[in-house]
Amino acid sequence: MINVGAFVASARSGARVVVGGDARGPVVSAARLGMKERLFAFLAHVPLLKHCDAVRRYAEQVRMENRRSLEVFVLALSKRYGPEGAKAAFDYGARRDGAPLDQRRVRNMVSIAEHFHGTGDAKPLARQMVFRSWECRGLDHPGHASLTIKNQADADAGRHVYEHVSWWPNQRLGSKEHFDRIEPKTLDGYRIDKRSEISSATEQRLREGDAARRKILADGFKYANQDERHDALFFPRAGQKLDKDAEWGLSARKVYFPAIGFNHDRRDTDRPRAFVLFGLNEAAMLRDARTVKEGAKSGELKYRMISKKENCASMALRVLRAGGAEHFVPYTAAWISEDPNHAHAYALAVQARIDALNQRRADVERRCERLRDSASVRQAWRAFSEAGGASASPLAEDAGRGRASAHMRQARLDEHAREVERIGAYFAELSAGRSGKHRDRADADLADAMKRCAPSARDDVAALTRKASVLVETLGRHLDAPPPSDSSALRRLAAHAMIGRIEAFMAAAIAA
């Protein structure tokens, strides 16, 4: 099956993408652009010559190739981003019938499909936060923003968490009430948000169109009257769909964030839970979300459409920032008023930074595992570990689940603190034992990072996140090249062990 990556790669040449094939199946490639093709492409735009048989045949052949390429590309998008994302890409990105599938169109359609499918590596995770927004197009179409905190990690569905923050005015706003502070209300779910973002007139036309198509399908086109034929042409656009209660709604742009701590992929429950080092603080976000809802009930908080603190976008951003978004990307407030577009852009920036750090962390893990493929490096690492009596068992999962006693948790924290001190002393001794001209650049960078970023049990989530990002990026840079010696490989493994200690302290910090 041809995938999206094949189209992206073929489009890089700048030529239009075509789909050919042989007995082995379809093949994506860049169209040939020789002298003959250039000549016919030029003649197809000359008024006096474009109707010549040869030119017309060439133009029709190109249109057919473009249509086939588009069909296969939309199918590939559907496989990767789902039918809704592929439909959106076709509706908004295909534009003209028979237009070439070039680099710009491929990039735009992939971007649109990603937008409707949702952005972020955390989408399949059991513990995640979803930032949703509907585009703002002015005061008449202000859009909306909301945020959902989900935790489906427990096997018992009754213990799952679904906290939705959606800030609305408690009454319909008039044209002169955009600056007024009025009573707010909060909606309890994404489905209600979707219904609220589609107008009554649009919903009526969608129902009439659906009914007309059903009648024409049942009775036959020739028995349909003019009104039914007209109504049947009104199809739902990308994002407009019926929910399970047969109500029309408009889907949002979605940005997914992971929660810090142990997590797993809902699609593969057989895989062991893994610790997510970079993410948002679920407990802190839940506390703030519930504070917001209590403020709405008590009257302490109000709604004001044009505001930097009291509209839907600012409230969604407030909860996002409570989870530690600013540990990854500094937040800059809007000049006059927050809006869903500005909020969406900030959410995307935070998501991109979090995903990049987690990908780098996973890459560091894989590369350090490869270092242990060497028997001599394994032996050196075993000797180093045994010298400190280091324990490989993490505190994190037991602490996060509340299954370890306070005494046991403290004992493990003390053990991790001793190991941090030992690794730090190892790098300090290494740094002091070499003169400037004999020091390896990678060793010097790692020693400096160890000195600045050694974790402790007193660190909060913000400090641990900052230290972890420095260590992961420093170690990641120097793992790109193979270590020149076993001793250099040992130092990289010691730095990797320090990242493991940060994970242990992070687990304790978020469980506190």
UniProtKB/Swiss-Prot annotation:
InterPro entries: Globular_prot_asu/bsu, SptP_N, SptP_N_sf
Residues forming coiled coils: 347-377
Subcellular location: Secreted
Gene3D superfamilies registered for this protein in UniProt: non globular Virulence effector SptP domain
Superkingdom, taxonomy of origin: Bacteria
Record-level GO cellular component terms: extracellular space
Family the entry assigns: Belongs to the BopA/IcsB family.
Protein name per UniProt: Effector protein BopA
Source species of the chain: Burkholderia mallei (strain ATCC 23344)
